[in-house]
């Protein structure tokens, strides 16, 4: 039992460590990670008494909060006696929010401004693909994404494609300093409300960087895009 958790934890740690500077190792660990992830889920939901266990919802919440399919299966298996369990409530809330940000769902419309006060409204860009990257001045992983985003920007110049970075800072000075330091060629907008703002809430942003692609009809086309797969995915739109 404990071995299933240990194996998953070890692979998750190794894979996360490799993401920064060893892409080949990261890629080689991905199928092992997926296998350990699936085994962990199967182990938790098949435990005797899982349906009525006060502890099982905590594990589901901790490990599978981002997985709509697994979350739905786990919730369907929980007994009604767990309805007042705080983690079941969290899982349900999370599940409902995740459903709203799946590909094919309408993208939440927002109006945000950049540091100079120029206003951008998402629905003004209907007819174009829109990439939205959620980022922050303090986010090291986000900075690693910048070269890949710049490649996307260069590859889509002159096409019906626009990009935004939604800054997740709460401090205006930090936001302004970050904008000036990185001088990105696309708009960086913010409501300075970080995770509690309506934009982050409606896009269910719980970790960054988080990247969405919105289609010309204003629907979510893809999310969790990163690095080379993001570049390839977007290049294919214009082939």
Q: For each predicted feature, which ranges?
A:
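A non-transmembrane, solvent-exposed segment enriched in polar/low-complexity residues
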Residues: 1-38
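Conserved redox-active cysteine motifs that mediate thiol-disulfide chemistry
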Residues: 126-129, 134-151
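Short, internal strand/loop/helix patches
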Residues: 111, 176-217
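Structural microenvironment flanking redox-active thiols in thiol-disulfide oxidoreductases
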Residues: 144-182, 194-201, 232
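N-terminal "domain-start" segment that seeds a small globular fold
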Residues: 89-122, 186, 233-235
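N-terminal targeting signals for export/organelle localization
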Residues: 34-106
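Thiol-/selenol-based redox modules, centered on thioredoxin-like
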Residues: 216-239
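Generic structural signal for well-ordered beta-strand positions
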Residues: 12, 20, 120-121, 221
């Amino acid at each position: 039992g404990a071995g299933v958790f240990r194996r998953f934890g070890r692979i998750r740690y190794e894979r996360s460590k490799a993401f920064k500077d060893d892409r080949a190792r990261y890629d080689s660990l991905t199928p092992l990670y997926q296998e350990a992830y699936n085994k962990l889920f199967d182990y938790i939901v098949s435990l005797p008494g899982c349906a009525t266990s006060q502890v099982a919802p905590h594990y589901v919440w901790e490990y599978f909060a981002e997985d709509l399919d697994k979350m739905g299966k786990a919730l369907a298996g929980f007994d009604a006696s767990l309805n007042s369990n705080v983690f079941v409530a969290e899982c349900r809330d999370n599940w409902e929010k995740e459903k709203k940000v799946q590909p094919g769902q309408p993208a939440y419309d927002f109006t945000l401004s950049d540091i100079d006060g120029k206003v951008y409204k998402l629905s003004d860009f209907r007819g174009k693909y829109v990439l939205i990257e959620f980022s922050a001045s303090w986010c090291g992983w986000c900075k690693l994404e910048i070269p890949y985003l710049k490649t996307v920007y260069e590859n889509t110049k002159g096409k019906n494609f626009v990009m935004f970075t939604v800054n997740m800072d709460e401090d205006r000075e930090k936001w302004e300093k970050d904008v000036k330091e990185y001088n990105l060629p696309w708009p960086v907008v913010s409501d300075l409300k970080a995770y509690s703002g309506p934009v982050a809430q409606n896009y269910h942003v719980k970790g960054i960087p988080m990247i969405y692609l919105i289609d010309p009809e204003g629907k979510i086309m893809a999310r969790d895009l990163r690095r080379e797969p993001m570049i390839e995915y977007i290049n294919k739109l214009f082939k």
